[in-house]
Regions:
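Short beta-strand/loop segment that forms part of the nucleotide-sugar
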Residues: 30-39, 57-59
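Short, well-formed alpha-helical segments that are part of the catalytic scaffolds
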Residues: 12-28
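A short, conserved alpha-helix in the catalytic core of glycosyltransferases
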Residues: 142-145, 149-154, 159-189
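Short aromatic/hydrophobic "clamp" motif used to bind/position activated sugar donors
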Residues: 81
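A conserved acidic beta->alpha catalytic loop
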Residues: 25, 36-45
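Glycine-rich, basic loop-to-helix element that forms the pyrophosphate-binding segment
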Residues: 59-76
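Non-catalytic, C-terminal membrane-associated alpha-helical segments of glycosyltransferases
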Residues: 207, 211-215, 226-281
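Conserved donor NDP-sugar-binding/catalytic core segment of glycosyltransferases
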Residues: 91-123
């Protein structure tokens, strides 16, 4: 096996300020499938011109994390794929370390890097050269997928626009006795929370708060039922309502917006509406 057997799948949305750092970190022998959640033809043209191993697909609208990744994954022709966020980057040894990890657990469905963020890079576990360790779920910013393991489970549930889609996928894999691992040897640099241009931070923050609450309720509803999910989110619902009232009284417009988004996301989820909210950018 070589790194040519791995396809990188990246989903982006207005990420032109940061995407090049990610792409520059990837060996040019790897095919990169980039799914851009817009109709930005200049973004596609410039990247495909500068990176010969990149194929950029424009969705025409913002499909979110799960559906856009599914578009990319369904175009993969290699045995393995690496889902990578645009605010993440590879170290020179990342792909070869992944290959050596595969040899220890060839039956894996997902392998994720042990250092889930930069704070963990000096973790003692990384120094021990441990084999991949079985887990029940991993974070979605970087996941190596064994494509053949997904024939009977599918990829992401597209009803989730953002958040909890990787937890849902891991849950479905575990339910079918598929194997998920953390690999201490595999390192990926992840800046976190900045997968888009800084100019749209405020609107993206509103969108994140809405979808975090919507996805929280619907993930638990899907796997535990409506009533259990309602019990789980009720404290969040009450807190959001109280804070909307408080911040309205003291004229804190920014805080009121945030908690209104949380309240709206939960109310829409509880009432059975889909994840319709999109950032206004």
């Amino acid at each position: 096996m070589s790194i040519k057997d791995i396809t990188i799948v990246i989903t982006s949305f207005k990420s032109d300020e940061i995407i090049r750092n990610c792409l520059n970190s990837i060996d040019n022998q790897c095919e990169i499938i980039l799914v851009e959640n817009s109709n930005n033809i200049d973004f596609k043209t410039n990247l495909e011109k500068d990176f010969k191993n990149v194929k950029c697909f424009l969705t025409g609208e913002n499909f979110g994390y799960g559906k856009a990744n599914n578009i990319g994954l369904n175009k993969v022709k290699t045995k393995y794929a690496l889902i990578l966020n645009p605010d993440a980057s590879l170290y020179p040894s990342t792909l070869n370390d992944f290959i050596s990890s595969i040899e220890k657990v060839p039956d894996f469905a997902i392998i994720a890097p042990f250092n889930q963020d930069q704070k963990n890079q000096n973790n003692k576990f990384e120094e021990r050269n441990l084999p991949p360790m079985p887990v029940n779920n991993v974070k979605g910013f970087a996941m190596f997928l064994n494509i053949s393991q997904f024939k009977d489970v599918g990829f992401f549930d597209e009803s989730f626009f953002i958040y909890f889609e990787e937890m849902d996928l891991c849950k479905r894999l575990i339910n079918l006795n598929k194997k998920i691992y953390l690999a201490p040897k595999v390192k990926i640099n992840h800046s976190g929370g900045q997968s888009h241009n800084k100019s749209i931070n405020e609107e993206m923050e509103l969108s994140r708060n809405w979808h975090w609450m919507w996805s929280t309720f619907n993930y638990h509803k899907k796997h535990k039922g409506f009533l259990v999910s309602l019990l789980i989110v009720f404290p969040k619902l009450s807190s959001a309502l109280i804070k909307v009232i408080i911040y309205s009284i003291i004229f804190n417009k920014n805080k009121r917006k945030i908690y209104y988004q949380r309240l709206s996301g939960l109310v829409n989820a509880i009432s059975g509406k889909n994840s319709w909210y999109r950032p206004k950018v």
